[in-house]
Amino acid sequence: MSVSAFNRRWAAVILEALTRHGVRHICIAPGSRSTPLTLAAAENSAFIHHTHFDERGLGHLALGLAKVSKQPVAVIVTSGTAVANLYPALIEAGLTGEKLILLTADRPPELIDCGANQAIRQPGMFASHPTHSISLPRPTQDIPARWLVSTIDHALGTLHAGGVHINCPFAEPLYGEMDDTGLSWQQRLGDWWQDDKPWLREAPRLESEKQRDWFFWRQKRGVVVAGRMSAEEGKKVTLWAQTLGWPLIGDVLSQTGQPLPCADLWLGNAKAISELQQAQIVVQLGSSLTGKRLLQWQAICEPEEYWIVDDIEGRLDPAHHRGRRLIANIADWLEQHPAEKRQPWCVEIPRLAEQAMQAVIARRDAFGEAQLAHRISDYLPEQGQLFVGNSLVVRLIDALSQLPAGYPVYSNRGASGIDGLLSTAAGVQRASGKPTLAIVGDLSALYDLNALALLRQVSAPLVLIVVNNNGGQIFSLLPTPKNERERFYLMPQNVHFEHAAAMFELKYHRPQNWQELETALADAWRTPTTTVIEMVVNDTDGAQTLQQLLAQVSHL
């Protein structure tokens, strides 16, 4: 009997089971203990294979692939700390709903807690963050193949969001020629191998029912808050709110076109807050809200009812409103709850939104990061998509820009970390094949710098704008101690990215004005390669411009 041959047959059943649940993209890091999984994935023609040498980046690459494909994405890593590097991507997926399947190779039980090399306690190491965790036994023909495949099917068939951790111990030898070992064990699955359905099919999840009193609430004064959703959902939400005559406060990730732009500016105006207090119901569609003023208003608003509609399970309401938590696909929910044509009830807010946008436009000429955030809609590629980083850049775009309705926008706004942003952007581009504009700060770029290796492999133009304000300037917006701010919060690195781009053979530009930036962009969109554009700006201008605009709009 060949241990290595049966390891591969065991792994082949696991990988084939994944294909029955829509897995097409599989991300693989190098490793020896994961050899059975890697070879099984390589031999399965249903998969599109992605590789990367850094497991943390690999997890985020999978996250980006899952964001766009809306399908589960598998990740294969070897044992030891390689597994721990998947933690950030797993956490993000749990908060934003992407489906990740983490196949982690492991030492067999007799090599754990005895000083064996590269052997750590992997079962349960992700605590409560996976939706499901499976600790498989070491491969053995004493366990029927139908147990293995039905165990996988149960976890994936009930997976609606987040990650599944499947820990896979393998004993040595890991290498060797294939023979007939375990062939009859594998063949007991019969015609399943020729089928394309799961061995075990789970019943579909029950979603929230239609709200029978909707006909009553739609006649009231309402407010629509739009969080993270798909491009198609964004367009439908805009039309729905417009028909109801309710003001729509659209997040940067809502893709609604933000019909009342600069919400995070005008929500700092007392007149706007006073008018919003008249709302009898707030319907929030989608989660992961960005704007600070929006979150502050959400925390203090007291409508008669506060409804949150999202496909992700969980509370999703840090303000703990009295109301309803409705688990449903947003587009389906809108269809179940049609709008009734009514006249808009808000008067002050549309006026304030227009005046706020005019105040932003009046400052658009200076070459700075706040101005870039406002202008970003002018620089979007046709038939493309936008990936927005975290920290200051996403807040500036949310507050100062107005993105087109239905234009795809992606970001990691679950845990809102700056780790893995370039890797996630790479996954977003690969899954869609669309021209992609990605924008991050300098510390975010440094954090995930080796992901530039992933950006060498693109199927359409990708532009990475690195806004270099020399540190974490979001802390300039916070009451951090002045004497300790630079050393302990901002942490300026005084670096530029020309040599990093050159190391990975990527195009590089460092424009000094808007004309040079626009010329670089025009050139970049012509070829299916990655271009790094480093925009060096004054350290604190972006934060100061935002604060000045907030003060100005608050007094309108």
UniProtKB/Swiss-Prot annotation:
Oligomer status and interactors: Homodimer.
InterPro entries linked: MenaQ_synth_MenD, MenD_middle, THDP-binding, Thiamin_PyroP_enz_TPP-bd_dom, TPP_enzyme_TPP-bd
Organism name: Escherichia coli O17:K52:H18 (strain UMN026 / ExPEC)
Gene this chain is encoded by: menD
Pfam families on file: TPP_enzyme_C, TPP_enzyme_M_2, TPP_enzyme_N
Gene3D superfamilies, alphabetized: 3.40.50.970, TPP-binding domain (3.40.50.1220)
CDD domains cross-referenced by the UniProt entry: TPP_PYR_MenD, TPP_SHCHC_synthase
UniProt-recorded name of the protein: 2-succinyl-5-enolpyruvyl-6-hydroxy-3-cyclohexene-1-carboxylate synthase
Co-factor note (free text): Binds 1 thiamine pyrophosphate per subunit.
Family annotation (PANTHER family): 2-SUCCINYL-5-ENOLPYRUVYL-6-HYDROXY-3-CYCLOHEXENE-1-CARBOXYLATE SYNTHASE, PROTEIN PHYLLO, CHLOROPLASTIC
Broad enzyme group: transferase
Disulphide bonds in the chain: none
EC number: 2.2.1.9
Pathway in which this enzyme or protein is active: Quinol/quinone metabolism; 1,4-dihydroxy-2-naphthoate biosynthesis; 1,4-dihydroxy-2-naphthoate from chorismate: step 2/7; Quinol/quinone metabolism; menaquinone biosynthesis
Gene Ontology BP annotations: menaquinone biosynthetic process
Family statement drawn from the similarity comment of this UniProt entry: Belongs to the TPP enzyme family. MenD subfamily.
Catalytic activity: isochorismate + 2-oxoglutarate + H(+) = 5-enolpyruvoyl-6-hydroxy-2-succinyl-cyclohex-3-ene-1-carboxylate + CO2
GO molecular function (one): thiamine pyrophosphate binding
Entry cofactors: Mg(2+); Mn(2+); thiamine diphosphate
Keywords, alphabetical: Magnesium, Manganese, Menaquinone biosynthesis, Metal-binding, Thiamine pyrophosphate, Transferase
